[in-house]
């Protein structure tokens, strides 16, 4: 049976994986660091205890980067502002990760929205 502690742990893991993904995406896109190097040196990524959490972060970040043009086009179509005017800049990365989960990954809609809001 699932108890409150289990639910809390699952929620914490979901939020943590998204925070680590955001940090990695920010470092790669805004600081022009190589993706493999960022994975190897990211304290947040290294600290993830579960291999499935590390795999999820890798999948989300690599898919976001691979599909960046498509994701940015979807955001541009849905936003009143040009992507370059979305502030703070990390908000654009949060939107990118959310769109990636909704469109390109098998993440349930409620989970993607809940974890990215």
Question: Which residues fall in each region the model found?
Answer:
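Class I Rossmann-like S-adenosyl-L-methionine
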Residues: 1-117
